[in-house]
Amino acid sequence: PTGGVNGQNIGEFIAAPFIHAVGGSWVCPKADIAAGNFEKITELCKQARSAALGFEVAHIGLNCEDAEAASAVCEKLNEAFALTVKDGNSSMFASGGIEVMKSMYLGKNGHIAIRTNSVPLAIAELAKKGFVCDMTTAKYKGGRMVAVYLKDEIGGFAVHLLQK
């Protein structure tokens, strides 16, 4: 779609599984094209790309040796900050922001989850910047990739993308 798309809603469009591209004249106003104001157009394109990707921190993951250790970490977080604990199969969450793994998973120190409006778009954008995804870690839901880890750690943390 191109009609009705703007900087405030482009992320909603790109997150829809049936939409593969979006556009709109707001990125390249006729007056700026006529005036040769390509710096402004370039900046609008960068803003549109950023809004389309919609990167945000989803949660931080901490690695623990086993379920008992994970439970102890969550209990301390609950005791200190009254964070609600939710137990899962392979991990526990203390609030929605801290995932405590029940085993030593990817990342020396744990992992950082980054939400995005489009995992495939994020993979392409990161590749342009020299970041490679480990496609063996990709997870799919209904034929759509919803998660994948970067190949290299950042600061001792594995980093994975999550579909919003």
Give a label for each model feature.
Residues 13, 48:
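Conserved, mostly hydrophobic/aromatic
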Residues 61-99, 121-128, 139-146:
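Core segments of cupin and vicinal oxygen chelate
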Residues 50-74, 107-114:
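N-terminal beta-strand motif that seeds the catalytic metal site of vicinal oxygen chelate
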Residues 27, 36, 55, 92-102, ...:
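Vicinal oxygen chelate
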Residues 108-136:
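Mid-chain, well-packed structural core segment of small domains
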Residues 15-19, 54, 106:
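Alpha-helix termination/capping residues and helix-transition junctions
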Residues 41, 45, 70, 119:
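Aromatic/hydrophobic pocket-lining residues that form the small-molecule binding cavity
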Residues 3-9, 18-41:
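Glycine-rich phosphate-binding active-site loops on the catalytic face of alpha/beta enzymes
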